[in-house]
Amino acid sequence: MDATSIITQVSRDDEQLNVYPSYPNDKDAWLGFSGSVWLPDCPADHAQLTHDVDRLKPQKRGLFHSLLCCWRRNRTKTNQNGTQIDGSTTPPPLPDQQRYLLPQVRLTDMHRKCMVIDLDETLVHSSFKPIPNADFIVPVEIDGTVHQVYVLKRPHVDEFLQKMGELYECVLFTASLAKYADPVADLLDKWNVFRARLFRESCVYYRGNYIKDLNRLGRDLQKIVIVDNSPASYIFHPDNAVPVKSWFDDVTDCELRELIPLFEKLSKVDSVYSVLCNSNQPLNNQTNQQQHPQELQQAPNQLHQQLQQQQQQQTISATTVITQATTLSAPTMLNQQQTSPPSPQSELLQKT
């Protein structure tokens, strides 16, 4: 087993990463499965907030790591709900007692929005290669061998988490394995900000990616915001996302600190869709947020078909005009030249 497969990361030019297996039911990939914005114009009353959001651009992402899900500790603060995903477009229906990934909202969070926060390349960067200035060194046992994972904290992550914990019901949601991500979260979360921790088992495997399906959280979609460096993670719910730049080791990075004013304002609006919209409408139709994921993939195909039809119609029209022009008799063309100034096209015909 490749040790790096326990961490889900995006790639950069100088790093070689593994990719997901071609088939999610591969026994080597699923053995031990434990279960558990591009942001255009928004309403005028959110003009300043929209200005803060517009600078955020989704980053181009590489392929994710290969999977190997292993056991993890049974923690009361870690949510254990979930089910194995067979690679279809949507997760299978869950029994009533396992319907949602998150527990009931605490009284202290009753009037707060839910913030889903990614881990790798959003809050930290981890490597199996020794890093002299690592903030944490986490031992991880893989196939009977203990490996050291070197973890760097993103600049201003402490300030960011502390402030978000005061404003939101915060949930850690990562596509990495719990045996790595859980101890990292223990060291990172000094203030017990994360009300729950969700790992790779809670994701939906769809078209080679692990998707964080916000429908399964058990919270009002209009009151959920996801902070993630990978657009593939929130492909089902792009209107709920605030994309962040992938971070590896830049000590001058200020992304998290600069996002704090945005999230302070976002915590006060009635619906996140009024700001994090991907259309000119202030609030998208709720059914668009809950539509079958396959329809999200079909929409570009329908647009492509419409463009092809338009091109075919233009070709037919152009052919008709050319045919009509060639059927004109010579006297008719001479009469037209006498009654009207010669056109560039007629001059070219005369020269030929």
Curated annotation (Swiss-Prot):
Phosphatase activity requires amyloid-like aggregation on the membrane. It catalyses: O-phospho-L-seryl-[protein] + H2O = L-seryl-[protein] + phosphate. One of its GO terms (molecular function) is RNA polymerase II CTD heptapeptide repeat phosphatase activity. It comes from the Eukaryota. Pfam families: NIF (PF03031). Residues 103-267 are annotated as: Mediates substrate recognition. Keywords: Cell membrane, Hydrolase, Membrane. GO terms for cellular component: plasma membrane. Its EC number is 3.1.3.16. Residues 284-310, 332-352 are annotated as: Disordered. Residues 108-266 form the FCP1 homology domain. InterPro entries: Dullard_phosphatase (IPR011948), FCP1_dom (IPR004274), HAD-like_sf (IPR036412), HAD_sf (IPR023214), RNA_Pol_CTD_Phosphatase (IPR040078), TIM50 (IPR050365). One of its GO terms (biological process) is positive regulation of embryonic development. It is found in: Cell membrane. Monomer. Forms higher-order protein aggregates with amyloid-like features during gastrulation. Interacts with babo, dah, Irk1, pch2, Ras64B, sax and Src64B. Prion-like membrane-associated phosphatase. Phosphatase activity depends on amyloid-like assembly at the membrane. Might have a role in establishment of segment polarity in embryos. This is Phosphatase Herzog. It comes from Drosophila melanogaster (Fruit fly). The gene is hzg.
